[in-house]
Amino acid sequence: MALLVPDKGERALLDMMLSDASPNAQNLRLYTAVTGGITESSIETDFTEATFTGYSIKALARATWNAASTATGTTTKTYPQQTWSPTSSQTIVGYYVTENTAGDLLWAEAFASSRALVSGDTLAVTLSIGLD
């Protein structure tokens, strides 16, 4: 599934871009299920967050996003790869990003196929946002 920015995330991202003097950082989270699928009306409480041993929420520092680049009409920013190394088992369906302070959902994406993690695995996620 493609990345989806729900209505709540659209409002928050526009505020961050255009009116927030000091926008809050974001958090990257993994999920095991989402109630009703990812839709325009999704909110953060629809997601069941991962709980495997070794899991942690990844704080996304605003200054760490790579410089924007444009290719074939799409301008993209990426965030350096984030990894998790579980020491217990859990199936991960995708990731979602929340605003750091209020925890509001900004965007979410399901993986092409779920990932059944076991001890010794590494799960890597590289965020990429594009506008065209």
Set out the residue ranges of the language-model regions.
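Small cysteine-rich, disulfide-bonded extracellular modules of the LU/uPAR three-finger superfamily
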Residues: 1-94, 99-132
